């Protein structure tokens, strides 16, 4: 069979990850020719990667999205030459795999020669249309998903298809692409008498979900022999998953790939860490570490103690907290090297005397300039001593003296210490976590959720620090990883955390000086220190690692109960704030669960058709200036306040 493949690719820097070449290596076995169409840039690395499979590489302006990329490829051949192929395969880099040979799919579909076009998977449509913009239909039709669609020869030769592509208008954005192409293509040509089908049959799931490949990918891969899965699975918002599931699809998918296939998991990790927000993939994959109070693998713990270099870095300022700091250090294995900074010679002598009683490998105390507090001491004086260590922990004697009542600040310190260093077994278990996961770069305690800290947590943990963190990351450190105000950083608020020194090397190597930090008195927020506190996870990501939260098992129970209490107490007030009509709907619900369901039905990313319809109606019927005024006011009051978003 003479088969042409058209592969669409977009990546902002034009870099081609290995998951793409893995996919193309199998796809190319089933093709006679391959053309790659790149929107925007294609790096030298990317060109070399694609050149393994074809010399026909088109790099075009980044406009028109996938639709115009495909159109460009079709136009480059012309209909006469395209008509010589038995099949034309159009696919793109939103898919990962395969987990089984693609030939199985091509052979199976070749048995049905009555089809004019076919695809990999189906979207079952919806009674309403959730996408904004001008709608061809007031509902979402059942359709072949555009990530993999195949045209047969007689379909390519048909005037209808040729006119469709010849007259395709420029595509403005994602919603325009869906409305003019993906969601309507199947129905438009079915209505004209053309026959179609999909390889992965999911008619039995149409009452289960409208999007099987995203909501139940494991079922499709295991039971329906689907060879491919969505890259989006790992970065899809957890809130969207929670509209349809308990959040389990991605964890199940990963377990299936790990335990039942030969698919190289490194291909997923490398792409996630390079291109995705850890806030999304760490939640979807349940990467938060819950640490038990007893050692789980004694043999491994002993091996780590014998063969790995372990360091504890501490900044000690408050001598009335020295006993607490010693108790923290006493939980570390005796092979640990401890590096301590303080601001006065008298304090140094007191610390050295106290720590001499602890069974540690070495203790080094340094007097440093009292500028930049714990963050300045860590980067300027302690970090240079940590090069060459495998695993390290940083802590300081935290006193949130500006927080009233004092119990709120003290509990912040409890959250940090309880989850980073609950006991000696906790420390060994954390070391095993790093040993078992080569991509783990940082483990941070969770953001405090009590007192006034709760509202900061609800705002994503940025406070007034998004712009200064972004500037530090992009301009000062010149690191290129995803950062957005709508994505919460998995950061060590309180500056107590575990890390691999290699993961923070781009930050450590900057050459920090105490003059980089403002003198006392420091503002309560918005300083370079607060930006550094939030930049740690992004630095680790740029170095090829990911950050995750860590909790002791006891605190995880507390955290769960805390979140349950907040959810119960806030659902109705939130409903009143967001939308009066929603409030009355929620207040009429018989239970808290029903109220939650009502709110998610209105505000959930997929089940929010009423909200989307209202927004679309406003956009379509109001003057542009009036519509923008309404949306601007809404965003100013209720958010979202940062980054790309939909209302």
Q: Where are the predicted features?
A:
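ER/Golgi luminal nucleotide-sugar-dependent glycosyltransferases, focusing on the catalytic module
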Residues: 1-647
């Amino acid at each position: 069979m003479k088969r042409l493949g058209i592969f669409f690719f977009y990546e902002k820097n034009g870099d081609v990850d290995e998951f793409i070449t893995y996919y193309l290596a199998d796809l190319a076995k089933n093709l006679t020719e391959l053309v790659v169409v790149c929107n925007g840039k294609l790096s030298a690395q990317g060109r070399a990667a694609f050149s393994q499979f074809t010399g026909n590489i088109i790099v075009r302006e980044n406009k028109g999205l996938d639709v115009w990329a495909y159109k460009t490829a079709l136009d480059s051949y012309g209909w006469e030459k395209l008509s010589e192929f038995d099949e034309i395969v159009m696919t793109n880099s939103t898919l990962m795999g395969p987990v089984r040979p693609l030939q199985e799919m091509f052979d199976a579909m070749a048995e049905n020669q009555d089809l004019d076009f076919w695809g990999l998977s189906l979207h079952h449509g919806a009674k309403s249309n959730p996408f904004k913009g001008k709608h061809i239909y007031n509902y979402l039709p059942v359709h072949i998903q555009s990530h993999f669609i195949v045209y047969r020869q007689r379909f390519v030769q048909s005037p209808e298809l040729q006119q469709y592509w010849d007259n395709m208008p420029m595509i403005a954005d994602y919603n325009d692409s869906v409305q003019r192409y993906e969601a309507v293509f199947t129905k438009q040509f079915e209505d004209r008498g053309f026959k179609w089908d999909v390889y992965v049959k999911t008619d039995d799931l149409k009452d289960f979900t409208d999007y099987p490949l995203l909501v139940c990918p494991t079922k499709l891969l295991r039971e329906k022999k689907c060879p491919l899965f969505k890259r989006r699975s790992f970065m899809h918002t957890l809130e969207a998953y929670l509209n349809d599931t308990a959040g389990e699809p991605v964890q199940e998918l990963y377990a299936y790939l790990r335990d039942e296939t030969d698919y190289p998991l490194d291909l997923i990790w490398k792409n996630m860490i390079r291109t995705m927000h850890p806030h999304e993939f760490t939640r979807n994959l349940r990467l938060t570490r819950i640490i038990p109070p007893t050692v789980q693998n004694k043999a491994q713990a002993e091996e780590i103690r014998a063969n790995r270099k372990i360091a504890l870095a501490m900044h000690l300022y408050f001598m009335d907290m020295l006993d607490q700091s010693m108790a923290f250090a006493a939980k570390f294995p005796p092979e640990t090297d401890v590096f301590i900074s303080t601001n006065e010679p008298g304090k140094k002598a007191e610390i050295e005397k106290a720590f001499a009683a602890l069974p540690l490998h070495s203790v080094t105390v340094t007097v440093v300039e009292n500028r930049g507090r714990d963050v300045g001491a860590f980067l300027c004086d302690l970090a240079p001593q940590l090069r060459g260590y495998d695993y390290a922990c940083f802590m300081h004697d935290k006193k949130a003296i500006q927080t009233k009542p004092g119990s709120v600040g003290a509990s912040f310190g409890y959250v940090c210490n309880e989850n980073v260093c609950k006991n000696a077994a906790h420390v060994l278990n954390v070391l095993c976590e790093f040993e078992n996961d080569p991509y783990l770069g940082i483990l941070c305690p969770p953001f405090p959720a009590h007192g006034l800290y709760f509202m900061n947590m609800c705002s994503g943990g940025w406070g007034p620090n998004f712009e200064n963190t972004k500037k530090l990351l992009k301009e000062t450190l010149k690191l290129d990883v995803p950062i957005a105000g709508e994505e919460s950083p998995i950061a060590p608020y309180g500056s107590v955390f575990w890390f691999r020194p290699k993961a923070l090397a781009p930050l450590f190597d900057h050459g920090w000086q105490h003059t980089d930090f403002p003198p006392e008195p420091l503002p309560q927020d918005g300083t370079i220190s607060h930006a550094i506190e939030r930049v740690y996870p992004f630095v680790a990501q740029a170095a090829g690692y990911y950050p995750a939260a860590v909790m002791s098992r006891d605190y995880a129970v507390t955290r769960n109960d805390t979140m349950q209490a907040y959810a119960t107490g806030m659902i109705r007030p939130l409903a009143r704030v967001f939308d009066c009509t929603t409030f009355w709907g929620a207040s009429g619900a018989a239970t808290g669960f029903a109220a939650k369901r009502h709110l998610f039905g209105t505000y959930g990313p997929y089940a929010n058709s009423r909200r989307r319809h209202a927004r679309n109606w406003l956009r379509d019927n109001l003057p542009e200036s009036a519509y923008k005024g309404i949306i601007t006011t809404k965003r100013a009051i209720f958010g979202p306040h940062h980054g790309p978003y939909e209302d």
